[in-house]
Amino acid sequence: MSETHLSTQKFADLPLHPEVKQALAENGFEFCTPIQALSLPVLLQSKDIAGQAQTGTGKTMAFLVATFNHLLSTPIPEGRQINQPRAIIMAPTRELAIQIAKDAILLAKHTRLKVGIVYGGESYDVQRKVLDQGVDILIGTTGRIIDYVRQGIISLTAIQAVVLDEADRMFDLGFIKDIRFLFRRMPDANQRLNMLFSATLSMKVQELAYDHMNDPVKVDIAPDEKTSKNIKEEVFYPSQEDKMRLLLTLIEEDWPEKAIVFSNTKHSCENLWSWLEGDGHRVGLLTGDVPQKKRIRILEQFTSGQLDILVATDVAARGLHISDVSHVYNYDLPDDCEDYVHRIGRTGRAGNKGVSISFACEEYALNLPAIESYINHSIPVSNYDSSALLEDIPAPVKIPRKHPAGTRNLRERAGAGRPQGAHRSGGRPPRHDRTRRHS
């Protein structure tokens, strides 16, 4: 994490339980991020919060530290049964739940608290075996949690801490009825510590907070900045004929360490994957049709560096928390302004620099004014020289319906890989000055 992203508040100076302090110190957490510095002093007084913060700001560690500290500092409810977790953390997607659980396990190392995770798309019985052994902190998606509640496998009547993460996405995905169902089965709001985090604190999110929380304190960092200052944004106006060649050329020039390419439809994403794979890139595809096990495998490959580029729709990418994404390419401008903010928020996280490149093509250019109005600034326009775009581009490959996406690695076949700015043919010079000129 970049030091410029941190505050002057030290975790060691906060009134935290010794076991929490030890876990933080051993994992290299010394200074708080701004959202942690603002929210933890409130939460450590057992006051509820409704926090507004973008992804990558450290909000996950903020609510995990508060949750662990609260459970370690609060007596266990009298008569608590093995099927009664003491804390529940609700997330909109499997991927986010998995990431939260990984961070929670870091803090759980020196405590007696057990962490369990449940989500759809995985073995029901395997997850049930974990629950049958008893968990203190339950992390998961609402649908699977409700399944276990309705069957009596878990009871929420001993809950002492509640976290609702990415509440705005909960609304987008239609999970609010599920959330209210779960809240109604917990102790009263004044008998538990309640935490809500959201990228935007819209009226509907605030209404949810005040309905199910105990006079929450609003914690807001950079409320007027919907996009991070660490992200360099630019937009091109390509013709439909140039659009794919422009993307391939920009990727060739930028040679991103780790990039996500967003498109608005499944068909367009599949087409993008075919061209990128054919051009020799290590690329994975995420759409709503990708099976859960394959989805997890692709994300692991992308996170570990086996894949350099991820092509995704908005629905498939919701809840992704992947570090070190250097570039985001909006092949299509999204129809929803909030989706633009969520897309580019995949890069420039935790104080790091990021690049966002958008295409305002003939089909989606009319979305740009609304996006710029929503983010309160104009996106710098970049021009390009059509004659300098790549021409010797291999034909797209067919999607391997029975094989993992992104398994072909033409770079490795060619040897040690292409140097930055060099094309497959070897002799072509970098096009940084020929292809892009800013106006």
UniProtKB/Swiss-Prot annotation:
Its main location: cytoplasm. It is an enzyme of class 3 (hydrolase). Keywords: ATP-binding, Cytoplasm, Helicase, Hydrolase, Nucleotide-binding, RNA-binding. SMART domains: DEXDc, HELICc. The keyword RNA-binding applies. Residues 243-390 form the Helicase C-terminal domain. A motif (DEAD box) lies at residues 165-168. It catalyses: ATP + H2O = ADP + phosphate + H(+). Residues 425-439 have a biased composition (Basic residues). It comes from the Bacteria. CDD domains: DEADc (cd00268), SF2_C_DEAD (cd18787). GO terms for cellular component: cytosol. GO terms for molecular function: ATP binding; ATP hydrolysis activity; RNA binding; RNA helicase activity. The keyword Phosphoprotein does not apply. Residues 40-219 form the Helicase ATP-binding domain. DEAD-box RNA helicase involved in RNA degradation. Has RNA-dependent ATPase activity and unwinds double-stranded RNA. Belongs to the DEAD box helicase family. RhlB subfamily. Component of the RNA degradosome, which is a multiprotein complex involved in RNA processing and mRNA degradation. This is ATP-dependent RNA helicase RhlB. It comes from Shewanella sp. (strain W3-18-1). The gene is rhlB.
